[in-house]
């Protein structure tokens, strides 16, 4: 895992902007420092980000920006940021609610450390295996339907991700859920403690 930047090193104003957002309301997108995302996938990603009207932080290599649709950066200035690498700090921020990733090992560990669910788009090598583990073993995220970015595929993955979280929440607060068990355990401690 990459160590965080020292406090106050908010070079791009990213953390300051995240501080103004609601908890779990920001989409974070990053494909690592090595991967070159295909231009048509960057276009689809930009369309999803703009259409969603959700706040976002997109951490990409500078040469990737030229593939966004004309005017995208201008139209989304108040909605999001497209900046170089700041991943650890971003994933540790409570405003981040979903992370779209290339499924690199460090990225997954940082996502877990930040408690952020993921949408995986592996590109090659170990990323493919990591993506399968993310979805099928750890169950902390989903991979894109077709394995590449399409507007429909990303929107569908977001929908599945939120439905999966809804089901977990319903289960946890249901009659036999962990929330009820924890409340009963707390009540036992409170009412059975001698003062």
Regions inferred by a protein language model and the residue ranges of each:
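Catalytic core of nucleotide-sugar-dependent glycosyltransferases
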Residues: 1-195
């Amino acid at each position: 895992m990459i160590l965080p930047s020292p406090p106050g090193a908010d070079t791009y104003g990213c953390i300051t902007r995240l501080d103004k957002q609601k908890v779990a309301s920001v989409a974070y997108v990053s494909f690592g420092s090595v991967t070159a995302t295909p231009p048509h996938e960057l276009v689809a990603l930009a369309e999803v980000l703009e259409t969603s009207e959700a706040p976002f932080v997109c951490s990409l290599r500078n040469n990737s920006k030229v593939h966004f649709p004309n005017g995208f950066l201008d139209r989304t200035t108040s909605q999001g940021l497209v900046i170089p690498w700041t991943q650890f700090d971003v994933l540790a921020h409570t405003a981040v609610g979903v992370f779209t990733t290339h499924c690199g090992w460090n990225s997954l560990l940082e996502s877990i450390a930040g408690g952020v669910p993921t949408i995986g788009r592996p590109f090659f090598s170990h990323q493919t295996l990591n993506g399968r583990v993310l979805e099928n073993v750890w169950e902390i995220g989903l991979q894109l339907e077709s394995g590449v970015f399409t507007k429909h595929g990303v929107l569908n993955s977001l929908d599945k991700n939120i439905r999966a979280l809804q089901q977990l929440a319903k289960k946890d607060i249901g009659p036999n859920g962990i929330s009820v068990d924890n409340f009963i355990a707390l009540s036992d401690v409170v009412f059975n403690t001698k003062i």
